[in-house]
Amino acid sequence: DEYMSIYGVNTWAMSTYESRRGLARNYITPIIGDMLLSDITPRMMDKYYRDLLSVKTVSVNNRKPTSEYLTPHTVREIHKLLRSAFNQAVRWELISRNPVLNATLPKEEHKERDIWTAETLSKAMEVCDDPILSLALNLAFSCSLRIGEMLGLTWDCIDIAPQSIENGSAYIFVNKELQRVTRGALDDLSDK
């Protein structure tokens, strides 16, 4: 809790804070949260990471989990959070070494993402009869915008005037992003 309230609040973006807070609340605090820092060893962390693979996934914000049990990817995200927390504990001189640095992590299968071809995009544009969705598809693919960036766009960030297009100076400037976060994360980061 101290790590999150001192380090996390001042360092992380809102969505990162919320994600890491959820990992801590659901998978770290209930399992190893009562242990003394000095009692945590690399061997114990190896067992903890192995055992996490048989922990049921917690549903967050009424979203259905994508798998029944924690995946190796989620265990690696938990490891990244713990590595950062223990590094901070070393800097704060609470412990002399980071017990997760040499821990063994589960292997993660890397899957290639399916990427739409020009033909798939063309077909999607043909069948799309909603002008706003059509605009969103065009923006997403022509400007490589993520959904949060698209939803954060305002007219003051866009110059598509005919003369700008003619002279090659048309632009879309992304300086805002819409993020889905909980009320708790908003409250914790209200001073940011």
Predicted ranges, named:
Residues M4-L94, H110:
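N-terminal core-binding DNA-recognition domain of tyrosine site-specific recombinases/integrases
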Residues L37, V100-A103, K192:
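Short clusters of hydrophobic/aromatic residues that line enzyme substrate/ligand-binding pockets
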Residues R50, L105-E108, N175-E177:
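Generic beta-structure capping elements
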Residues V58-P72, R76-I78, R91, I95-W155, ...:
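Basic, Lys/Arg- and aromatic-enriched nucleic-acid-binding interface segment
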Residues K123-V127, P131, A161, G168-K192:
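Basic, alpha-helical nucleic-acid-contacting "clamp/cap" segments
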